[in-house]
């Protein structure tokens, strides 16, 4: 899992990437390729 201050560029790395909010944090999740996971902060 990568930690970045901005997730906008990480969302465009793969077409299945989605941005979700969980417990006040912003995550990028990817079901088909989990190595694209990222967290904002």
Curated annotation (Swiss-Prot):
- Keyword Ribosomal protein carried by entry: yes
Which InterPro entries does this UniProt record tie to the protein? Ribosomal_bL36 (IPR000473), Ribosomal_bL36_sp (IPR035977), Ribosomal_L36_bact (IPR047621)
One Gene Ontology term of the biological-process aspect is: translation
Please tell me one Gene Ontology term that the record gives under cellular component: ribosome
Give the GO molecular function terms. structural constituent of ribosome
* A Pfam family this chain is assigned to: Ribosomal_L36
Q: Which UniProt keywords apply?
A: Ribonucleoprotein, Ribosomal protein
> Any keyword NAD?
no
UniProt lists the family membership as follows: Belongs to the bacterial ribosomal protein bL36 family.
Name of the molecule in the record: Large ribosomal subunit protein bL36
Taxonomic lineage: Bacteria, Pseudomonadati, Pseudomonadota, Alphaproteobacteria, Hyphomonadales
- Which gene underlies this protein? rpmJ
